[in-house]
Amino acid sequence: MELVVGASEATMKSLLGKLGNLLAQEYALISGIRGDIQYINDELASMQAFLRDLSNVPEGHSHGHRMKDWMKQIRDIAYDVEDCIDDFAHRLPQDSISDAKWSFLLTKIYELWTWWPRRVIASNIAQLKVRAQQIADRRSRYGVNNPEHLDSSSSARTRAVNYEIAEYQVTSPQIIGIKEPVGMKTVMEELEVWLTNPQAENGQAVLSIVGFGGVGKTTIATALYRKVSEKFQCRASVAVSQNYDQGKVLNSILSQVSNQEQGSSTTISEKKNLTSGAKSMLKTALSLLRGNCICQPENDGNPDNTPIRLQETTDDDQNPRKLEQLLAEKSYILLIDDIWSAETWESIRSILPKNNKGGRIIVTTRFQAVGSTCSPLETDRLHTVDFLTDDESQNLFNTSICESKIRKDSNKVDEQVPEEIWKICGGLPLAIVSMAGLVACNPRKACCDWSKLCKSLFPEQETPLTLDGVTRILDCCYNDLPADLKTCLLYLSIFPKGWKISRKRLSRRWIAEGFANEKQGLTQERVAEAYFNQLTRRNLVRPMEHGSNGKVKTFQVHDMVLEYIMSKSIEENFITVVGGHWQMTAPSNKVRRLSMQSSGSNRGSSTKGLNLAQVRSLTVFGNLNHVPFHSFNYGIIQVLDLEDWKGLKERHMTEICQMLLLKYLSIRRTEISKIPSKIQKLEYLETLDIRETYVRDLPKSIVQLKRIISILGGNKNTRKGLRLPQEKSKKPIKNPSPQGKTKEPAKKGFLSQEKGKGAMKALRVLSGIEIVEESSEVAAGLHQLTGLRKLAIYKLNITKGGDTFKQLQSSIEYLGSCGLQTLAINDENSEFINSLGDMPAPPRYLVALELSGKLEKLPKWITSITTLNKLTISVTVLRTETLEILHILPSLFSLTFAFSLSAAKQDQDIIKDILENNKLDSDGEIVIPAEGFKSLKLLRFFAPLVPKLSFLDKNAMPALEIIEMRFKDFEGLFGIEILENLREVHLKVSDGAEAITKFLVNDLKVNTEKPKVFVDGIVTA
């Protein structure tokens, strides 16, 4: 079937649940409309069954415009009914009366109080019933046949099956390594030599990489960029695409180069101020921490990994001159991905400075003519990417299947999988990995079924593969998805091309949209994670970064996959994109989910002509000048994602507080400094993301949000925390003690029962808060958050023995017994984290622990936490003895030793003494124990000085895959060649490194064949 039914069926499924709940609320229904609601419920249930049957109809059966129009009517009435039900839930609140013991009098009072809104809703429901009747009649009147009348005996196409949610969930923590392009070893070596050829240093040279969409151009260009970037003084990468925006491209390049310039200025300052060695070292340490230590911020969007704020503060008219000044006397390399026209290249070239320092530009394009325009000179180079050979295709197919399988021991491909599957892909990597994901997720499918599938997809056996052929393959993979996963996949079309999408951000949005609900005993969060794992296994999304817990941190959607799902979303009116990288036709019907993206010279992303009155979800990307808040119906919007939008003003927050059904609100990295007290009106709010804003205090009314699940605040990079509300009783307590003395005013927890019954009981994540000496009420209030699963304190500055100290210790101990899974504390004076070991009851459910500060010793109970997966502790406890204690932890996936911000504030001599004493305690070197660390895959060290580390036994950390180090001084890494599973070592050298450090780094890189050693930073001695 060509029709899109996934999102419609999922919408219907959610709606039927709401109708069922409404029918159960007898007291809220007006006499006479129960029958109408029951009729609508039954009719929509039949429509849902029709849609489900429709999704299983074999390919080749199409009803043309009649079926599409009828499905559009089903979709529209489903959306309108859902709006009506949501309005019903809001206008007839139940929380305040659900516990009341209803009497006849109370019932009459309630009916009188809600008479008018119930009448309005009754009228709307009656109209919807009439529409449902008309839609049902229209289907038979115009000959829209039932799916069972069609030939459904064919098994040629893959069908969506009812996967168990448990199957989605089975996954193990992983680390993303750096993968080389398949079949490109020789070519990569040649291109790498060309890019670094000293004979061409007299001027700018351009490498154009041309090829069919999905053939791997960006993969090759990115691999080259990564390999050679350390040999250039400046570097930047940017995505362009069809809707080219010169200002955006220029700002992105400028911000990346400016950031590098600011980093290099530290070295110049050091050379000019040799007498101020202590300050210099401290300054460098702080710089290292703010950029790259345990407080490394997530990148949830910007595809070029560039600071957003700098882009907003630059003057467009001055930017070309600024870029020319920055690059005038420097060698540079630029990666410009996905150029669509010669005009776009000419525009880009006009803003790039020319010098005689050997500038290199790598461009990718689908079009040979564009590639020739970009590389017209003899000093330039044009490389066309060919399709893979049969051997390369089979190797990629087999490798992808093994990576997509659930079980760890699934390291070979079943012999029953016919070779036709990878042969129909025509050597196109995107098609090959997509089909591999399909095969891996259908292990019970017989060989004959796969052969029939291949013949049905390509009965004409066409070669080479065309764009239509790629679409057929993607259709096949899409149609195999269950309805829930189809909806989740289509939702990704909200994000711009090339965007690095945060998995957590996406999961929270899925939950707010109602796409991931509790199922088979799993929470919404676990279901969302399971859905994402399934999309990853099917190779429909590409993980880009893994967090230190082994879960995907950020991912991307391949350009061709994004184009495909965007076309499906438009067909079903599921997502509407304004602006963006591609030219899209505006929908003629109502907009439900709006994605506004800056593009071209039009930063307003005009919504003229669109019906925005029924927008339920609004997302803003880029530097938009205007968002038409006045056009929205505040009573409908449930998801509002304004992350990084610098146009957000304080007055907008007042309007946002009128969006009474809002479930998800993100104003992360905006200029907002205050949250209005009226936020308490958002009684359905589940996620509040105010990270990296100027908001320092939450209003007292925040405790009225009974459904809030996640509060995300503060700035992990700068360790600025969010202050929770607190208050004191004004009247002193008279004669409370036998001595007859008057005590100080009694302190209440900020979540005291007087704030409202059940305040914030749903809260699961509280991240980025600040607790200081005056925060005893906050410390006491944490005790009441018994559902808390994550607590992150970005700033802790309290005195040992004080009231706040005792309250916090008591709260953490209690929360640990209630199921706390993640605990992160940045202790500025280190007294609290050093006292944690004395807790009588350890937090036995911990999965992740982060202790930042001048930690003196490990907590005594740490070896009893068998569930611990991620551990981040201060480098001040880096000793051989520490590793000998930790090596017995059975589930530990990542171990990080970091140089904490609090330690960096100490005198240089104290810092040096701590590190030197650690070495002496370990006999001059840190030796990794020969046994233990059975599950450890990631080992990291972030410090100004990394002492000598030695692996003396091949059984030391047997599962270790990646070592990361960031430092200014380095004393060597020995024995890594004997570690069988170690794949990569990443070294980041801070500015101002000594000659001996550069020598050791170069020696390690040059003389180590396995594992691969990657260096970030200029290390030529």
Curated annotation (Swiss-Prot):
Q: What induces it?
A: By M.oryzae pathogen infection.
Mind telling me what this protein is named?
Disease resistance protein Pikm2-TS
Q: Which domain of life is it from?
A: Eukaryota
Disulfide bond sites: none
GO biological process, alphabetically ordered:
defense response; response to other organism
Does the record carry ATP-binding as a key word?
yes
Q: Which organism is it from?
A: Oryza sativa subsp. japonica (Rice)
Bilayer-crossing residues are none
Specify the NB-ARC domain's residue ranges. 186-519
Where do the segments described as Structured coiled coil (CC) domain lie? 1-182
Keywords of this protein's UniProt record, alphabetized? ATP-binding, Coiled coil, Leucine-rich repeat, Nucleotide-binding, Plant defense, Repeat
Function recorded in the entry: Disease resistance (R) protein. Resistance proteins guard the plant against pathogens that contain an appropriate avirulence protein via an indirect interaction with this avirulence protein. That triggers a defense system including the hypersensitive response, which restricts the pathogen growth. Contribution of Pikm-1 is required to recognize the effector avirulence protein AVR-Pik.
Q: Where is this region: Disordered?
A: 297-317, 719-751
Pfam families hit by this protein: LRR_14, NB-ARC, Rx_N, WH_DRP
Q: Which CDD domains match?
A: RX-CC_like
Q: Where are the LRR repeats?
A: 612-634, 659-682, 683-705, 785-807, 817-841, 843-865, 866-888, 912-935, 957-981
Assigned protein family: Belongs to the disease resistance NB-LRR family.
Q: Name one GO molecular function term.
A: ADP binding
Q: In which tissues is it expressed?
A: Constitutively expressed.
Which PANTHER family does UniProt cross-reference here?
DISEASE RESISTANCE PROTEIN PIK6-NP, DISEASE RESISTANCE PROTEIN RP
